[in-house]
Structure formats: C-alpha cells, structure tokens
Amino acid sequence: MHGPIKKIDKMFKFPVVLKPINEGSSVGVYIANKKNFNKNLMKLQKFKEILIEKYIPGREIQAAVLGNKKLGIIELKPKRKFYDYKAKYSSKAKTKHIIPVNIKKKDYQNVMNIALKAHKVLKCRGVTRSDFKFHNGKFYLLETNTQPGMTNLSLVPEIALYHGMNFFSLINWIIKDLSLIHI
C-alpha cells in the first residue's frame, strides 16, 4: 500500500465512497476498497471534482420535506450492493420500497427533525429529500437533495402518495410554491 491509498486508509479506513460532486442519481458513485480503489478512481477522471467519504453500512432511509413541513420517510432495500443508478432506474434491479418504515416512533421523529433542520439550514425552498443510513442504532445524514426526482420511480412522489397527496397535487403544490418567489 502506497501513496494516496495509504493516506486515504489512514483518514477513513476502507471501504470509501467515491463520487463526482456535480452529478445526481448516483451517476459515477463507487464503493471502493484497497483492491479496486485505483481502478474506480480512474473511472472518475472525466469529472472535474470528486468527493471521497467514509462508507457507512446500514439501512437506506430517505426523508422528504415539503415547504417547511415534514412529509415522511421511506426505506430502500436494493438487491445490489448499494442504491446506485442501476438500482434506481433499471427494471431488473428490483429495489424494495418499504413504507411505512419499521422503526421506533422516536427514531422516525428524529429523522424527520434532522431532514427539516437540514432543509432550513441550507435555506431550501420547495421539496427536498434527505438520505440517511441507519447503522448500530444511529442515523447518519448523507446528503440533502435539493432537486429530488419527480418521475414515476421517484421517492418523493411515493412518500407523498402514502401520506394522501397524489402526483397531480404534489406538482400543483410545487408550482404554487414557485409562484411565490419574488424576483
């Protein structure tokens, strides 16, 4: 082990997550270990900037915020190693979407409070989706998506529908919210 790999192993311990900064939908995201780190890093050369972060195992939990209100959460169980682009958009991926999520009420409230706080701290408008990992009884906020997907496979519309808001109503809410912006 030498050079950058040695430094990264000291900072994070493998495995690590490699991802381009300006992409979405997990495009270009890799879970790298010592053995495949260089190979995966080479695949990311086309991107201007990349992020290297600690890999956190655990359950995939997503929380949606609508305006300044907590909307709800969903759990994902991908058949693949993690919820990557193929797990999101391939018809063969068969990622399970679990709603309602089987967690304690206090944990549910905790996740929603963190998602709402992230939404407010980042000065977000409209709809956001915060991605969490739940591991060893703790929630880890991975990121807050300020432009979550709005397709028939997307999570926010699914969460909204579970809580009584159909897709048409969700889109109307977003349009109305946008109309309140003063330019």
Where are these regions (language model features)?
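Conserved small/polar residues in nucleotide/adenosyl-binding loops
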Residues: 181-183
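A short, polar/charged loop-to-alpha-helix boundary motif
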Residues: 81-87, 151-159
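Amphipathic alpha-helical segments that line or abut small-molecule/effector binding pockets
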Residues: 112-116, 168-176
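Conserved metal-phosphate-binding beta-hairpin within the catalytic cores
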Residues: 54, 63-65, 119-150, 160
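Active-site anion/phosphate-binding pocket segments in diverse small-molecule metabolic enzymes
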Residues: 72-75, 114, 118-125
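Active-site nucleotide/adenylate-binding loops and adjacent lid/helix of ATP-dependent enzymes
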Residues: 1-58
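Internal helix-turn-beta structural module
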Residues: 151-154, 161-173
